[in-house]
Amino acid sequence: MRNMITMGEFIVKKQADYPTATGELTSLLSSIRLAAKVVNREINKAGLADIIGSMGAENVQGEVQQKLDVYANERFKAALEARGEVCGIASEEEEDFVSFDSELSRHSKYVVLIDPLDGSSNIDVNVSVGTIFSIYRRLSAPGTGVTLEDFLQPGNRQVAAGYVVYGSSTMLVYTTGFGVNGFTYDPSIGCFCLSHENIRIPEEGKIYSINEGNYIKFPDGVKKYLKYCQERDEATHRPYTSRYIGSLVSDFHRNLLKGGIYIYPSGTNSPNGKLRLLYECNPMAFLVEQAGGKASDGFGRIMDIQPTALHQRTPYFVGSTKMVERAEAFMREFSAHEDPANQG
């Protein structure tokens, strides 16, 4: 039996490799880990408690807030504020960023952007849901109040990013820019334990994930790419398999381990796509690039986009490098008019 390594031990060991490390990021990741355990507990008993269903209100995205959305948002906010290693957060569930104003928080150097519970509308039918997080160094001076500009940074400036998938087992996957590692929660000891070390996404995959019910609304480039995926060709091992859960974390997690592409394109009713650049796309882009994959808006690198708004949306193509590059080629050939570079 191999030695069990907890996430806490793993992070401390990695920190020891950098003598100048102060431990603030280690403490911050510990806070996220703690909140994930609390949310996991509530999800596991959701069917027995009065937390399934909607609150009857909408969040800033215009989506009906689920009770667990609100619960998860509050738990992560509380955990991140408690230790003072974060000066503020931006959440998919909040209209504006949240500033933490304790003396310790104001002098901290990190901000966190988070989707507290991705896919929560599926919780009452027992489909896996998740949490997505992203960490940046603030741009404003420590000791001052956090500003909007601290959050509106391109993804290539991320310090760390990760997600938690709450499913048949609960798993936390993260990167600090030195590879991707996954930790599975062991409820018997209350710890996340290293289960997937140095995750690498296959360069080529056989899975495509997209909501084909929206096919009629897709750009021509996406329609042509889907046709390519469905055509038989032994040389390229086609047709590919279609797998779509409707929870970004779950679909991304499967494709990360098995190889594949996840697509949420623009549409006639959503010209900028649906997914949020800051809360969903950038964190997953950082992870997939660190694992050897690629993330794009169909024409260019997701992490090079300069955000202009907290809740900005973007088309999204993420997964195995060769699959994403092939999808980009179809977009350039058949949907070039949608490329922002070609628009005034």
UniProtKB/Swiss-Prot annotation:
Cofactor section: Mg(2+)
Subcellular location, record wording: Cytoplasm
Cofactor note as given: Binds 2 magnesium ions per subunit.
Principal location: cytoplasm
Residues the record lists as binding substrate: 118-121, 211, 244, 274
GO cellular component, one term: cytosol
GO biological process, one term: gluconeogenesis
Entry EC number(s): 3.1.3.11
Keyword annotations from UniProtKB, A to Z: Carbohydrate metabolism, Cytoplasm, Hydrolase, Magnesium, Metal-binding
Binding-site positions, Mg(2+) 1: 92, 115, 117
Annotated residues for binding of Mg(2+) 2: 115, 118, 280
Subunit organization: Homotetramer.
Protein name: Fructose-1,6-bisphosphatase class 1
Protein's organism: Aeromonas salmonicida (strain A449)
Gene from which this protein is expressed: fbp
